[in-house]
Design a protein with these regions (language model features):
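Glycine-rich beta->alpha junctions and the first turn(s) of the following alpha-helix
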Residues: 221-315
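Glycine-rich phosphate/pyrophosphate-binding beta-alpha loops
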Residues: 177-182, 265-268, 385-388
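C-terminal helix-coil-helix/basic helical segment that borders enzyme active sites and/or dimer interfaces
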Residues: 44, 48-52, 317-348, 361-369
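Glycine-rich phosphate/cofactor-binding loops in nucleotide/flavin-utilizing enzymes
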Residues: 3, 366-409
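Amphipathic, small/basic residue-rich leader segments at the start of a protein or domain
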Residues: 1-107
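A short core secondary-structure module
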Residues: 178-215
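Charged, amphipathic alpha-helical oligomerization/scaffolding segments
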Residues: 35-38, 275, 282, 311, ...
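Glycine-rich flavin
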Residues: 58-66, 71-175, 180
Length: 409
Protein backbone atom coordinates (compact mmCIF):
# COMPACT_ATOMS: atom_id res chain seq x y z
CA UNK A 1 0.00 0.00 0.00
CA UNK A 2 1.35 3.42 -0.95
CA UNK A 3 2.10 5.62 2.05
CA UNK A 4 1.34 9.34 1.84
CA UNK A 5 0.69 12.33 4.06
CA UNK A 6 -1.27 12.24 7.32
CA UNK A 7 -4.48 10.24 7.29
CA UNK A 8 -6.38 13.42 8.01
CA UNK A 9 -4.15 15.99 6.37
CA UNK A 10 -2.04 18.61 8.09
CA UNK A 11 -3.20 20.26 11.29
CA UNK A 12 -4.40 23.22 9.25
CA UNK A 13 -6.45 20.95 7.00
CA UNK A 14 -4.85 22.42 3.88
CA UNK A 15 -3.30 19.28 2.38
CA UNK A 16 -5.63 17.13 0.24
CA UNK A 17 -5.15 13.38 0.47
CA UNK A 18 -3.04 11.88 -2.29
CA UNK A 19 -4.10 9.30 -4.81
CA UNK A 20 -3.52 5.81 -3.42
CA UNK A 21 -2.38 2.82 -5.41
CA UNK A 22 -5.40 0.79 -4.30
CA UNK A 23 -7.84 3.35 -5.75
CA UNK A 24 -8.22 3.43 -9.53
CA UNK A 25 -9.94 6.83 -9.24
CA UNK A 26 -7.27 8.49 -7.11
CA UNK A 27 -7.06 11.56 -9.36
CA UNK A 28 -10.84 12.01 -9.15
CA UNK A 29 -10.70 11.73 -5.35
CA UNK A 30 -7.98 14.39 -5.21
CA UNK A 31 -10.09 16.74 -7.36
CA UNK A 32 -13.09 16.08 -5.12
CA UNK A 33 -11.16 16.97 -1.98
CA UNK A 34 -9.50 19.99 -3.58
CA UNK A 35 -12.97 21.24 -4.43
CA UNK A 36 -14.00 20.86 -0.80
CA UNK A 37 -10.92 22.73 0.43
CA UNK A 38 -12.08 25.77 -1.52
CA UNK A 39 -15.37 25.87 0.44
CA UNK A 40 -14.33 24.45 3.81
CA UNK A 41 -14.76 27.82 5.54
CA UNK A 42 -18.38 27.81 4.34
CA UNK A 43 -18.89 24.38 5.94
CA UNK A 44 -17.22 25.52 9.16
CA UNK A 45 -19.34 28.65 9.46
CA UNK A 46 -22.55 26.70 8.90
CA UNK A 47 -21.48 24.04 11.40
CA UNK A 48 -20.99 26.73 14.05
CA UNK A 49 -24.42 28.25 13.37
CA UNK A 50 -26.24 24.94 13.52
CA UNK A 51 -24.37 23.90 16.64
CA UNK A 52 -25.85 26.94 18.37
CA UNK A 53 -29.39 26.18 17.21
CA UNK A 54 -29.16 22.39 17.35
CA UNK A 55 -31.06 22.22 14.05
CA UNK A 56 -30.08 19.74 11.33
CA UNK A 57 -28.75 21.32 8.12
CA UNK A 58 -30.33 19.56 5.09
CA UNK A 59 -28.31 21.74 2.72
CA UNK A 60 -25.19 19.96 3.94
CA UNK A 61 -26.53 16.68 2.58
CA UNK A 62 -27.42 18.28 -0.75
CA UNK A 63 -23.98 19.83 -1.13
CA UNK A 64 -22.18 16.60 -0.25
CA UNK A 65 -24.34 14.71 -2.75
CA UNK A 66 -23.94 17.29 -5.52
CA UNK A 67 -20.16 17.29 -5.08
CA UNK A 68 -19.97 13.49 -5.34
CA UNK A 69 -18.95 12.69 -1.76
CA UNK A 70 -21.74 10.12 -1.33
CA UNK A 71 -20.29 7.99 -4.17
CA UNK A 72 -16.82 7.68 -2.64
CA UNK A 73 -17.08 4.03 -1.41
CA UNK A 74 -19.36 2.85 -4.23
CA UNK A 75 -17.65 0.45 -6.65
CA UNK A 76 -16.06 1.85 -9.79
CA UNK A 77 -18.08 -0.47 -12.02
CA UNK A 78 -21.26 0.90 -10.45
CA UNK A 79 -20.30 4.51 -11.13
CA UNK A 80 -18.63 5.35 -7.82
CA UNK A 81 -15.05 6.14 -6.86
CA UNK A 82 -14.24 2.70 -5.45
CA UNK A 83 -12.28 4.25 -2.59
CA UNK A 84 -10.50 2.26 0.08
CA UNK A 85 -10.86 2.81 3.82
CA UNK A 86 -7.61 4.79 3.78
CA UNK A 87 -8.98 7.34 1.32
CA UNK A 88 -12.33 7.47 3.10
CA UNK A 89 -10.45 8.22 6.33
CA UNK A 90 -8.72 11.13 4.62
CA UNK A 91 -12.03 12.59 3.51
CA UNK A 92 -13.83 12.09 6.82
CA UNK A 93 -10.92 13.46 8.83
CA UNK A 94 -10.58 16.51 6.62
CA UNK A 95 -14.31 17.24 6.72
CA UNK A 96 -14.34 16.78 10.51
CA UNK A 97 -11.92 19.69 10.83
CA UNK A 98 -14.64 21.96 9.43
CA UNK A 99 -17.93 20.20 10.16
CA UNK A 100 -17.87 17.15 12.48
CA UNK A 101 -21.59 16.52 12.02
CA UNK A 102 -21.21 16.30 8.24
CA UNK A 103 -18.27 13.95 8.80
CA UNK A 104 -20.42 11.75 11.05
CA UNK A 105 -23.07 11.55 8.33
CA UNK A 106 -20.39 10.28 5.94
CA UNK A 107 -19.07 7.76 8.48
CA UNK A 108 -22.47 6.07 8.62
CA UNK A 109 -23.05 6.31 4.87
CA UNK A 110 -19.59 5.04 3.95
CA UNK A 111 -19.62 2.05 6.29
CA UNK A 112 -22.91 0.80 4.81
CA UNK A 113 -21.80 1.28 1.21
CA UNK A 114 -18.44 -0.35 1.91
CA UNK A 115 -20.36 -3.37 3.17
CA UNK A 116 -22.54 -3.29 0.05
CA UNK A 117 -19.50 -2.99 -2.23
CA UNK A 118 -17.94 -6.05 -0.58
CA UNK A 119 -21.24 -7.95 -0.86
CA UNK A 120 -20.86 -8.71 2.87
CA UNK A 121 -24.15 -10.59 3.43
CA UNK A 122 -25.83 -8.49 0.70
CA UNK A 123 -27.70 -10.36 -2.07
CA UNK A 124 -26.61 -9.19 -5.50
CA UNK A 125 -29.93 -7.67 -6.72
CA UNK A 126 -30.37 -5.58 -3.56
CA UNK A 127 -26.73 -4.48 -3.52
CA UNK A 128 -26.89 -3.49 -7.18
CA UNK A 129 -30.10 -1.48 -6.67
CA UNK A 130 -28.65 0.48 -3.74
CA UNK A 131 -25.49 1.19 -5.71
CA UNK A 132 -27.51 2.45 -8.67
CA UNK A 133 -29.49 4.71 -6.35
CA UNK A 134 -26.29 6.06 -4.81
CA UNK A 135 -25.13 7.17 -8.25
CA UNK A 136 -28.34 8.20 -10.05
CA UNK A 137 -30.17 9.88 -7.15
CA UNK A 138 -27.69 9.98 -4.28
CA UNK A 139 -29.08 10.07 -0.77
CA UNK A 140 -27.77 9.25 2.68
CA UNK A 141 -28.09 5.78 4.14
CA UNK A 142 -27.54 4.71 7.75
CA UNK A 143 -27.62 1.47 9.73
CA UNK A 144 -30.11 1.44 12.62
CA UNK A 145 -28.41 -0.88 15.11
CA UNK A 146 -28.98 0.55 18.60
CA UNK A 147 -32.24 0.41 20.55
CA UNK A 148 -33.51 2.26 23.65
CA UNK A 149 -33.98 -0.96 25.63
CA UNK A 150 -31.18 -3.13 24.26
CA UNK A 151 -28.60 -0.40 23.89
CA UNK A 152 -25.65 -1.11 21.62
CA UNK A 153 -25.51 -4.32 19.61
CA UNK A 154 -21.85 -4.67 20.68
CA UNK A 155 -22.96 -5.94 24.09
CA UNK A 156 -24.77 -8.86 22.48
CA UNK A 157 -28.44 -9.74 22.72
CA UNK A 158 -31.22 -10.06 20.19
CA UNK A 159 -32.81 -6.87 18.82
CA UNK A 160 -36.25 -5.91 20.07
CA UNK A 161 -37.29 -4.84 16.58
CA UNK A 162 -39.31 -7.72 15.12
CA UNK A 163 -39.96 -8.78 11.52
CA UNK A 164 -43.14 -10.78 10.94
CA UNK A 165 -43.69 -12.68 7.70
CA UNK A 166 -46.82 -11.63 5.77
CA UNK A 167 -48.19 -12.08 2.29
CA UNK A 168 -46.65 -8.77 1.23
CA UNK A 169 -43.24 -9.22 2.82
CA UNK A 170 -41.80 -8.67 6.27
CA UNK A 171 -43.71 -6.40 8.66
CA UNK A 172 -41.35 -4.47 10.94
CA UNK A 173 -42.23 -3.21 14.41
CA UNK A 174 -39.79 -1.67 16.86
CA UNK A 175 -37.90 1.37 18.04
CA UNK A 176 -34.36 2.42 17.13
CA UNK A 177 -32.09 4.85 18.97
CA UNK A 178 -29.49 7.40 17.85
CA UNK A 179 -30.44 7.44 14.18
CA UNK A 180 -27.96 10.10 13.09
CA UNK A 181 -29.15 12.44 10.35
CA UNK A 182 -32.68 11.03 10.20
CA UNK A 183 -34.14 14.21 8.58
CA UNK A 184 -31.66 13.80 5.72
CA UNK A 185 -31.71 10.02 5.27
CA UNK A 186 -33.11 8.34 2.16
CA UNK A 187 -32.69 4.70 3.22
CA UNK A 188 -32.68 2.98 6.60
CA UNK A 189 -30.87 -0.32 7.16
CA UNK A 190 -32.69 -1.77 10.16
CA UNK A 191 -31.29 -4.54 12.35
CA UNK A 192 -34.18 -6.80 13.38
CA UNK A 193 -35.06 -10.38 14.29
CA UNK A 194 -37.77 -12.56 12.83
CA UNK A 195 -40.60 -13.89 15.00
CA UNK A 196 -40.02 -17.45 13.78
CA UNK A 197 -39.76 -20.33 16.30
CA UNK A 198 -36.00 -20.12 15.79
CA UNK A 199 -35.46 -16.38 15.23
CA UNK A 200 -33.07 -15.13 12.59
CA UNK A 201 -31.36 -11.74 12.65
CA UNK A 202 -30.48 -9.54 9.70
CA UNK A 203 -30.68 -6.11 8.12
CA UNK A 204 -33.90 -4.89 6.51
CA UNK A 205 -33.79 -2.00 4.01
CA UNK A 206 -36.54 0.57 4.49
CA UNK A 207 -37.21 3.83 2.69
CA UNK A 208 -36.97 6.67 5.20
CA UNK A 209 -40.28 7.98 3.88
CA UNK A 210 -42.11 4.65 4.13
CA UNK A 211 -45.50 4.43 5.83
CA UNK A 212 -45.09 3.62 9.50
CA UNK A 213 -41.71 5.33 9.97
CA UNK A 214 -41.95 8.03 12.66
CA UNK A 215 -39.23 10.19 14.18
CA UNK A 216 -39.14 11.00 17.90
CA UNK A 217 -37.15 14.28 18.06
CA UNK A 218 -35.37 13.65 21.37
CA UNK A 219 -31.67 14.21 20.58
CA UNK A 220 -30.40 16.83 23.05
CA UNK A 221 -26.72 16.02 23.66
CA UNK A 222 -24.12 18.69 24.31
CA UNK A 223 -22.00 17.48 21.40
CA UNK A 224 -22.81 16.82 17.73
CA UNK A 225 -25.85 18.96 18.47
CA UNK A 226 -27.04 19.36 14.89
CA UNK A 227 -26.74 15.65 14.02
CA UNK A 228 -30.45 14.98 14.68
CA UNK A 229 -29.60 11.57 16.14
CA UNK A 230 -33.20 11.00 17.15
CA UNK A 231 -35.12 7.82 17.90
CA UNK A 232 -37.21 6.23 15.16
CA UNK A 233 -40.38 4.17 15.61
CA UNK A 234 -41.25 1.50 13.04
CA UNK A 235 -44.90 0.52 13.13
CA UNK A 236 -46.11 -2.13 10.67
CA UNK A 237 -43.54 -1.11 8.07
CA UNK A 238 -43.67 -3.46 5.08
CA UNK A 239 -40.33 -4.65 3.67
CA UNK A 240 -40.27 -6.82 0.52
CA UNK A 241 -38.64 -10.19 1.10
CA UNK A 242 -35.89 -9.34 -1.38
CA UNK A 243 -34.91 -6.21 0.57
CA UNK A 244 -33.05 -7.99 3.35
CA UNK A 245 -29.50 -9.12 3.88
CA UNK A 246 -28.66 -12.70 4.78
CA UNK A 247 -30.62 -13.73 7.88
CA UNK A 248 -28.61 -15.57 10.53
CA UNK A 249 -29.62 -18.08 13.18
CA UNK A 250 -27.91 -17.85 16.53
CA UNK A 251 -24.95 -15.52 16.07
CA UNK A 252 -26.73 -12.20 15.76
CA UNK A 253 -23.46 -10.26 15.51
CA UNK A 254 -22.74 -11.77 12.09
CA UNK A 255 -25.87 -10.11 10.72
CA UNK A 256 -24.27 -6.65 10.62
CA UNK A 257 -21.29 -7.91 8.64
CA UNK A 258 -17.61 -7.51 9.40
CA UNK A 259 -16.90 -4.91 6.69
CA UNK A 260 -19.46 -2.48 8.10
CA UNK A 261 -17.98 -2.72 11.59
CA UNK A 262 -14.37 -2.50 10.35
CA UNK A 263 -15.09 0.69 8.42
CA UNK A 264 -17.08 2.10 11.33
CA UNK A 265 -14.05 1.84 13.59
CA UNK A 266 -11.56 3.27 11.11
CA UNK A 267 -13.80 6.15 10.10
CA UNK A 268 -14.75 7.12 13.65
CA UNK A 269 -11.04 7.23 14.44
CA UNK A 270 -10.48 9.62 11.53
CA UNK A 271 -13.44 11.77 12.56
CA UNK A 272 -12.38 12.34 16.16
CA UNK A 273 -8.75 12.76 15.12
CA UNK A 274 -10.00 15.52 12.82
CA UNK A 275 -11.90 17.17 15.67
CA UNK A 276 -8.71 17.32 17.75
CA UNK A 277 -6.74 18.69 14.79
CA UNK A 278 -9.28 21.49 14.49
CA UNK A 279 -8.98 22.19 18.21
CA UNK A 280 -5.19 22.27 17.98
CA UNK A 281 -5.26 24.56 14.93
CA UNK A 282 -7.39 27.09 16.83
CA UNK A 283 -5.16 26.83 19.91
CA UNK A 284 -1.99 27.35 17.87
CA UNK A 285 -3.43 30.49 16.31
CA UNK A 286 -4.52 31.75 19.74
CA UNK A 287 -1.14 31.14 21.34
CA UNK A 288 0.68 32.82 18.46
CA UNK A 289 -1.46 35.95 18.51
CA UNK A 290 -2.22 36.38 22.20
CA UNK A 291 0.30 38.79 23.76
CA UNK A 292 -0.45 39.54 27.45
CA UNK A 293 0.55 43.06 28.45
CA UNK A 294 2.68 41.80 31.32
CA UNK A 295 4.55 39.36 29.05
CA UNK A 296 5.18 41.47 25.98
CA UNK A 297 5.46 38.48 23.68
CA UNK A 298 3.14 35.74 22.38
CA UNK A 299 2.07 32.91 24.67
CA UNK A 300 3.53 30.57 22.06
CA UNK A 301 7.02 31.54 23.23
CA UNK A 302 6.48 30.08 26.72
CA UNK A 303 8.11 26.66 27.28
CA UNK A 304 5.14 25.14 29.11
CA UNK A 305 2.80 26.18 26.27
CA UNK A 306 5.19 24.59 23.79
CA UNK A 307 5.27 21.43 25.90
CA UNK A 308 1.47 21.22 26.04
CA UNK A 309 0.99 21.84 22.32
CA UNK A 310 3.79 19.41 21.50
CA UNK A 311 2.20 16.68 23.58
CA UNK A 312 -1.04 16.95 21.59
CA UNK A 313 0.82 17.17 18.28
CA UNK A 314 2.80 14.00 19.00
CA UNK A 315 -0.38 12.17 19.98
CA UNK A 316 -1.93 13.14 16.65
CA UNK A 317 1.15 11.77 14.90
CA UNK A 318 0.59 8.50 16.76
CA UNK A 319 -3.07 8.57 15.70
CA UNK A 320 -1.93 8.84 12.11
CA UNK A 321 0.25 5.75 12.41
CA UNK A 322 -2.56 3.77 14.05
CA UNK A 323 -5.18 4.78 11.49
CA UNK A 324 -2.89 3.98 8.56
CA UNK A 325 -1.93 0.60 9.97
CA UNK A 326 -5.56 -0.27 10.58
CA UNK A 327 -6.65 0.77 7.07
CA UNK A 328 -3.82 -1.32 5.62
CA UNK A 329 -4.93 -4.36 7.61
CA UNK A 330 -8.53 -3.90 6.47
CA UNK A 331 -7.38 -3.57 2.86
CA UNK A 332 -5.36 -6.79 3.00
CA UNK A 333 -7.91 -8.63 5.14
CA UNK A 334 -5.47 -9.26 7.98
CA UNK A 335 -8.02 -10.73 10.38
CA UNK A 336 -5.36 -11.52 13.00
CA UNK A 337 -4.63 -7.86 13.71
CA UNK A 338 -7.86 -6.09 12.70
CA UNK A 339 -9.64 -6.89 15.96
CA UNK A 340 -6.78 -5.86 18.23
CA UNK A 341 -6.08 -2.74 16.16
CA UNK A 342 -9.76 -1.76 16.35
CA UNK A 343 -9.62 -1.93 20.13
CA UNK A 344 -6.58 0.34 20.17
CA UNK A 345 -8.20 2.88 17.84
CA UNK A 346 -11.38 3.01 19.93
CA UNK A 347 -9.58 3.48 23.25
CA UNK A 348 -6.58 5.54 22.12
CA UNK A 349 -7.92 7.64 19.23
CA UNK A 350 -11.69 7.94 19.64
CA UNK A 351 -12.12 7.86 23.41
CA UNK A 352 -9.05 9.96 24.18
CA UNK A 353 -9.97 12.77 21.80
CA UNK A 354 -11.76 14.53 24.65
CA UNK A 355 -8.66 14.20 26.85
CA UNK A 356 -6.67 16.07 24.21
CA UNK A 357 -9.23 18.84 23.79
CA UNK A 358 -9.33 19.18 27.58
CA UNK A 359 -5.56 19.66 27.60
CA UNK A 360 -5.95 22.42 25.03
CA UNK A 361 -8.71 24.07 27.05
CA UNK A 362 -6.38 24.10 30.04
CA UNK A 363 -3.81 26.24 28.23
CA UNK A 364 -6.31 28.44 26.37
CA UNK A 365 -8.07 29.57 29.54
CA UNK A 366 -11.23 31.66 29.31
CA UNK A 367 -10.88 32.19 25.57
CA UNK A 368 -11.13 28.45 25.01
CA UNK A 369 -14.50 28.28 26.74
CA UNK A 370 -16.02 31.16 24.80
CA UNK A 371 -18.87 30.13 22.51
CA UNK A 372 -17.42 32.52 19.92
CA UNK A 373 -14.43 30.26 19.49
CA UNK A 374 -13.98 26.82 17.97
CA UNK A 375 -12.28 25.07 20.88
CA UNK A 376 -15.23 24.64 23.22
CA UNK A 377 -17.35 23.14 20.43
CA UNK A 378 -14.51 20.79 19.52
CA UNK A 379 -14.41 19.62 23.12
CA UNK A 380 -18.16 19.01 23.26
CA UNK A 381 -18.03 17.08 19.99
CA UNK A 382 -15.00 15.09 21.16
CA UNK A 383 -16.92 13.94 24.24
CA UNK A 384 -19.34 12.13 21.93
CA UNK A 385 -16.55 9.79 20.86
CA UNK A 386 -16.89 7.91 24.12
CA UNK A 387 -20.55 7.03 23.54
CA UNK A 388 -19.88 5.15 20.30
CA UNK A 389 -19.94 1.39 20.64
CA UNK A 390 -18.09 -0.57 21.80
CA UNK A 391 -17.67 1.26 25.09
CA UNK A 392 -14.25 1.44 26.70
CA UNK A 393 -15.10 -0.89 29.58
CA UNK A 394 -16.11 -3.66 27.19
CA UNK A 395 -12.99 -3.17 25.05
CA UNK A 396 -10.69 -3.29 28.09
CA UNK A 397 -12.47 -6.31 29.54
CA UNK A 398 -12.12 -8.25 26.29
CA UNK A 399 -8.43 -7.34 26.12
CA UNK A 400 -8.00 -8.49 29.71
CA UNK A 401 -9.74 -11.78 29.02
CA UNK A 402 -7.41 -12.36 26.08
CA UNK A 403 -4.20 -11.81 28.03
CA UNK A 404 -5.35 -13.53 31.23
CA UNK A 405 -7.43 -16.45 30.00
CA UNK A 406 -5.79 -17.45 26.71
CA UNK A 407 -3.44 -20.40 27.27
CA UNK A 408 0.20 -19.66 26.40
CA UNK A 409 1.59 -21.18 23.22
Amino acid sequence: MTRGPSATGAVSGETPPPAHSDDASGADITRLVTQFLSVRKHFAARAARHDRTGIFAPETVRELADAGFLRVPVRLQAGGYGASLSVAQNIVGLLAQSDPVAALLLVNHYMVHASIAARDNWPEPLARRLEEQAVSRPGLINALLAEPDLGSASQGGSPGTVATATGDGWRLNGRKAYVTGIPGLSELVVRARTDEPEPRVGLFVVSAGADGVTTVPNWDHIGMRASASHEVILRDVIVPYEDTTTLFHGDAKAASGSVLMHWNCGLLGALYDGVVRSALAWTIDFLRTRIPSNLGKPLATLPFMQDAAGRVSLTLATNNLLLRAYASDVLTGNAVTISSDAAVIKTEVVDKAADLTMQLLAIAGNAGLSARNTLERCHRDALCGRIHAPHAELVRRRAGQTVLLTPPL
